[in-house]
From Swiss-Prot:
It comes from the Eukaryota. This is ATP synthase F(0) complex subunit 8. It comes from Talpa europaea. Component of the ATP synthase complex composed at least of ATP5F1A/subunit alpha, ATP5F1B/subunit beta, ATP5MC1/subunit c (homooctomer), MT-ATP6/subunit a, MT-ATP8/subunit 8, ATP5ME/subunit e, ATP5MF/subunit f, ATP5MG/subunit g, ATP5MK/subunit k, ATP5MJ/subunit j, ATP5F1C/subunit gamma, ATP5F1D/subunit delta, ATP5F1E/subunit epsilon, ATP5PF/subunit F6, ATP5PB/subunit b, ATP5PD/subunit d, ATP5PO/subunit OSCP. The modification N6-succinyllysine is found at residue 54. Belongs to the ATPase protein 8 family. The modification N6-acetyllysine is found at residues 54, 57. The chain crosses the membrane at residues 8-24. It is a single-pass membrane protein.
Length: 67
């Protein structure tokens, strides 16, 4: 059986890791980050829903009269 030549593995792995690192750096550098992030007020996020203003009753099957 022939011997497996592993002499180029180090170079291949090193080149792959370097290439991936450069690609990820280029990808991350294209993002635009806000200069000063601010909290949004919670009052502007409140939605009016129809069931908040009126009273509703939920009937569970056990509370219904027996037939």
């Amino acid at each position: 059986m022939p011997q497996l030549d592993t002499s180029t593995w180090f170079t291949t792995i090193l080149a792959t890791i370097t290439t991936l690192f450069i690609l990820f750096q280029l990808k991350i550098s294209k993002y635009i980050y806000p200069s000063s992030p601010e909290l949004k007020s919670m009052k502007s996020l409140k939605h009016n829903t129809p069931w908040e203003t009126k009273w509703t009753k939920i009937y569970s099957p056990l509370s219904l009269p027996l037939q």
